Amino acid sequence: MTLFIQSDATGAGSGNVDAPEAFVNLVVIANGDTGLGFTDLSPRIQQITYARTLGGAPPVRLDTLVNTFFGVNPQNIDIIIVPVLENFVLADGSRMNRRGITLSPAGSGLPGASLNSTTSCLVVYDTTDRNRLGQCLARAGTGGTRDLPISNPVTLYHELSHASRVVTNALLQVTRECDPASPEENAAITEENDMRTQIATALGVAPELRDPNIHCARKGCRGDGCCIVATVASGSHLSAEVDALRSLRDGYLRRSEAGFAFFGRLHEAYYGFSPEVVRLMAAHAGLRDVVLRRYVRPLVSALQTIEDYTLGGMRGAELTRQLREHGDDSTEAELALLDGDAAATADLSGPERELSATLIAHAGRDPYVRWALIDPLFLHRTARRAAAARLTNEEIGRTLAAAIDGWAAQLPIEDFWPSLTRSEARGELRFLADCLLVTADARRRFGMRLAAAFPDTRAIHAALADEPDFGEEDE
Amino acid sequence: MTDAGLVAHLRSVRELDDALEVVVDVGNDSDRTLHYVAEVRAIDYDPATRRLRLRLSDRGRQLVIEAAMVEPTFRTVEPHSEASLVLSLPRTIVRLAPQAERSPEPRFEEHRIADATEVEVEIGWSRTPYYADVRARAEPPEAWEDGTAHASLTVRPE
């Protein structure tokens, strides 16, 4: 019998742990099995007993934890559940505030051991926030939407999953990675979903499962932050426009070193001027619609068309139709404005002129903003001019493809490249070939720019030679 | 055009019936919006010196196994403006007590941080909003910080 609940804390008086809540949570894990009980081992800890009568993954795991001697210490006090309150802090000062953690035994060398002053495995969780309504995790099947709450029994079961591997010396790799989650967290979230399914089944509702690949969570079940101009212009951080931009940013591009470095520079520039655009929209109500119709929607449409081409494999007439389906309500006037044509401001209202001055001043000068947020808009001009020249949809699609290839090859080159090994650089080039530089011509043009940017970096040149089409001969 | 970082000033520390309230003024003299961590992520208290350090940052946080890695709450302060941040803390904290001879059972120690006579605040800030690092070799959230604003206040015992 090796599972215990801390019922009091020596030296601190009573009232700093909530043992009844922990036992109730164990009852839920046991699915209400009447075979669960406890005895007072000492004034400070209760020993859990379990003569299981029910099946199911959570009761079976609990049975194993309660009725196995793991030999973590000579006293056979292997796992202690410590149901703390919100004023508990760990030895590194970090607050427990809504967290559930597992501390490996002191001296074990496993994660959390240096924060544990005992020879037991401690499962510490904050019991004060009932149903953890303020904590939102990634819901399975949604592409990472963080709106899934976590209850106390689910938190405890998640931690007991970790504890079971700590005491059997079977812990998987633990890292700080959030998305994708580390192997250990992936395993615990997968098992956590057994608990979610058991609770849902007992309630007669469909289970709401957590995405095992995403470990991080946020407070407040709002969407991930993104794109303040689009958010204000569209009126919601959950709008289709913001969702599309967020998906493009996080779903693929920021997962690579090249994409992450690029977005770091883009954010630096974008958040330097976008609050000013937001302030203008706040001061002049009509500007919101202008920004949404003339800039945000055409940009989303262009970026989605680029994605259709690079990741979706669309070509020819299909690409042309897709661009039209995404929508094309940009006008030549806006494009002329963004192209720096001063005459194009003649018919604008005062606020519109102020807005365009802000955009031109920043967008025109910054290569990152220009490449990511302005140049894609000109895809609409390319399509319009091709249509005006009476090209077929197939021919317009080919023209669009050439324009996208040309744009992709001009991806700003970041200074992280020389820090990569040959193998890492090769990985980045392959990533770019998969998601952006999808033709040999685009790869060759980008490869030439990269080689010219770092003429003395051997790893880069070797990687370019390794990868087909990037334009360098092997050494 | 200025490029200064976040500036913090600890305005007041007072004990309420159910909380310790700490009010911090944050200022931004730069030409762009600054983003900062707006919640106390860690509390360090030394009962011997009655020195309380509140960290609005994940710097120094050790790697542990936990149910979810909950990101901090963030706020912004506009260019050339100030904002106030009201931090509500428990009046006492509880933590695991060190044990000279290790035993299997935890011992707790409880401290009244409302008795602090020296209060320090550290606030992590950045020029851009926080977005989770989704790379395979992800860096921890604190890598987002461009700097740390410091403020302190000596509290006179009543």
Question: What function would you assign to each model-found segment?
Answer:
Chain B
Residues 18-22:
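Structural beta-strand segments of beta-rich domains
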Residues 11-13, 39, 43, 50-52, ...:
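Generic beta-strand hydrophobic packing signal
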Residues 73-158:
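Surface-exposed edge beta-strand/loop patches
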Residues 1-14:
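N-terminal edge beta-strand
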Residues 16-17, 79:
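Surface-exposed loops/turns
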Residues 24-33:
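Asparagine-centered strand-capping/turn motif at beta-strand->loop junctions
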Residues 14-15, 28:
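Short polar catalytic/cofactor-binding loops
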Residues 33-82:
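The feature marks short-to-medium sequence segments in extracytoplasmic or secretory-pathway proteins
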